[in-house]
Amino acid sequence: GEWSALETLTHVRDVIVHVYGLRLRRLFYEHEPVFADFDEEAYRPASLARGESVEYLLDTIVGEHEQLARLLEAVPDAEWAREGRHPQFGIMSIEFLARRVGEHAEEHAAQITAAARAR
């Protein structure tokens, strides 16, 4: 079924912090890192059990986006092509992951709004 607004916000936070944020930081500091898979189904129950508020989740999501934006602004043009590898999804560059950060948030924004209205 559909996730609630809280479940969706928790997912968005987990992905920005533990997937895209971590992978981007590894690309900034490592040569051709190999990225681990993110088992969302295993991670989500523990993440939801923390009982974080909507406000806390939003603050974390916004803060992580702002921090990544500052880090990305400092990346020289030639470095945007730096790559790491995911065992299942293949090559991922800084540019690809930076785009996914924004796309992922946009993909879930309408879902969060609809879930909040349906409450």
What is each of the regions a protein language model found here?
Residues G1-E40, E66-A69, E73, E83-R119:
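Short, contiguous alpha-helical
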Residues E41-A81:
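Acidic/histidine-rich alpha-helical segments that form the ligand environment
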